[in-house]
């Protein structure tokens, strides 16, 4: 059943890449901040209290797994959450949770 969900939402290699990207607390915080809407790099820097090179590194990781979309406006980059990608990832995680429930129920009936 899980393999069906993986094909519907995203490839397992993509899920793995996203999990790796989310394994850092700074990147988790960035995702959280972007759930409120597009943010300029300057706004993220101010809220997170990190350096510009550190932010650039984290944004590159999030862009590489397509969780974040970047666009230039003047001298600053503006970032937004790729909501379709985020929804697909969440759908995969929820499918695991649902599968665990089904397995848990069937174990008791054996």
Residue ranges and their predicted role:
Residues 13-54, 73, 77-85:
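N-terminal helix-turn-helix DNA-binding core of bacterial DNA-binding proteins
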Residues 3-5, 15-16, 51-53, 61-63:
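Short secondary-structure boundary micro-motifs
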Residues 5-9, 34, 64:
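Compositionally biased, intrinsically disordered low-complexity segments
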Residues 1-14, 85-110:
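Amphipathic alpha-helical dimerization/coiled-coil segments
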């Amino acid at each position: 059943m899980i393999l069906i969900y993986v094909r519907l939402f995203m490839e397992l290699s993509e899920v793995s890449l996203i999990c790796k990207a989310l394994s850092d607390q700074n990147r988790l915080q960035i995702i959280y901040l972007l759930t409120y809407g597009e943010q300029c790099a300057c706004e993220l820097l101010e809220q997170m209290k990190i350096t510009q090179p550190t932010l650039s590194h984290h944004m590159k990781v999030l862009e590489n797994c397509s969780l974040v979309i970047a666009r230039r406006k003047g001298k600053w980059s503006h970032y937004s959450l790729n909501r379709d990608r985020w929804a697909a990832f969440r759908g995969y995680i929820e499918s695991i949770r649902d599968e665990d429930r089904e397995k848990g129920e069937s174990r008791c009936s054996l």
